[in-house]
Amino acid sequence: MRISLCQGLLTGAIILNLLILYYVSRAQQQMMEKRKELGRGTRRAALPASGLGGGLGVLVGAGGEPGVVGAEGHSRGPRVTVLLREFENFENYVGDVANSFLRQRPELPFLAVSDTSPYPPLVLPEGARLLVLSPSPDQPPQAHRPEFHVQTEFVLLVPDGVELEQPRAIERLIRELEGEGGGPVRLVAAPVLARSAVQCLHLRVNLREWTATYSPAASGSSGSVCTALQGDAVVLIRTEDLFNLSVPLGHPLFSSLFVQTALRGWKVKLLESPCFAANHRPLFSSAHNQWKADTRLKEATGKLMRSFGLKRLLMPDGKDQWYGCSKETPRCFGTVQDDTPDYLYLDRWTPPCCLRALRETTKYVINILETSGVRYWLEGGTLLGAVRHQDIIPWDYDVDLGIYLEDVPNCDHLKNLDSGSLVDANGYVWERAVEGDFYRVQYSEANHLHVDLWPFYPRNGVMTKDTWTEHKQDVEFPEHFLQPLVPMSFAGITAYSPNNQRAFLELKFGEGVIENPQYPNPAKKRLDRSKL
């Protein structure tokens, strides 16, 4: 078969194109491999820092070369960003701290972080940067997000006034953290000398009960391992771990940090050495500035705990700190619909401040009833809580007491309530409830947590009343349950109850009610008993 000239030219062109395509592909592959290799040595900042008078660009080390110092101080680039979060605008030493670290370790990125732009402005040395967290309408969302401004493997969280005297101290912290591998220790800390002694604490956070409990932790020979710190310390954490927290740089920093890490099961290891110096002691030059700082810290702690849904802190010294409702403020939840308060939908129980108010109101009301000669008994769900817990049911939102109707005239607080309400000398509000023929005692005019008093009278040996609610437990019952009334422990006091509590409760709620807890309206929200 003869090949024409045109066929020969076409075949040659095809072969030539295939050769060109082959060499172009090889060249592209080699170029990509070269770029990948170069990329291992240099990590570039994703975005410029906002409000800094210039971009972060590449985090430049000593001698103008990009890179981070490794565990031995001679790696290709800095592994640690020094971050200072806590300082006061009216008196601080952020510039001195930055100078201290950059003088010893000029290759390390130094980042000061503030909620708003400080006034007076910070005076920072070259190599230190300021990041303002509050967003500005003329900037992209990434501009105020710290995770876009930290490009190193670790973050070293330092307090104001600290000084780096030992350049190798940071490498010691890195080695300690890396030595923990993938275990529960995810943070390593070193003390700051000549400040308040740092203490290792155990922290247990119970979001369901709105509570955080701090307790002292024992020290070990190679350092203490715990879940929180109290006092001044320098803390090293992996950048990935820090920015996987819901609020990585909350204020106060340690309070925010350790609540979140404790919930994740992470631990912090507090070393005895190295130690960091404090070049300003005390941190504030006047008692007035110290008072201002303490006041701002208290306000910031309250704001933080409320944002985390923590209303009670049990401190290591046994004292309580409360961040919930009080006699002067409204209760923590609104009007209850379908017998299901809003907090149950959040998989939480009654806030501890609300339980405290209910206990105080119950104790107060029972004392007045007993003093006045009014026979009463723990009724309904309140009796159920007393039998199960010797306290209020953890998710209940009021207290119910039954009383003898014929005894109402004995009590000055009750007998004149047919019209209006009464605010007594201790701020409790006594009223005839608008929902029915019963009485209600509120914690205060502002806080409507309450005790309900249900008047019953005997008829043919049965305790009854004239109006009823739709609750299944609101039924008549034999008077023999009240003859006699028996004392029992309830909410820190001794109160009276029916004499056969199991039979009384099973008459009202059904068989097995004591052993099988359930929310008031399972059709709306059912209790997961496996989590009890």
Segments predicted by a language model, with ranges:
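Active-site nucleotide-sugar/metal-binding loop of Leloir-type enzymes
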Residues: P141-V155
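C-terminal catalytic/acceptor-binding lobe
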Residues: G12-L19, G39-G67, G220-V225, Q230-D232, ...
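Conserved catalytic core of two-metal-ion nucleotidyltransferases
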Residues: L9, L16, D347-S372, N416-K508, ...
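Active-site nucleotide-donor binding segment shared across nucleotidyl transfer reactions
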Residues: I366-Y397, P409
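Short beta-strand-to-loop acidic/aromatic patch adjacent to the donor-nucleotide binding site
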Residues: Q151-E165, G402
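Short, acidic, metal-binding catalytic loop of nucleotide-sugar glycosyltransferases
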Residues: S75, D96-L108
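Conserved catalytic core of nucleotide-sugar-dependent glycosyltransferases
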Residues: E165-S246, A425-F456, M463-H471
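N-terminal signal-anchor transmembrane helix specifying type II single-pass membrane topology
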Residues: M1-L47
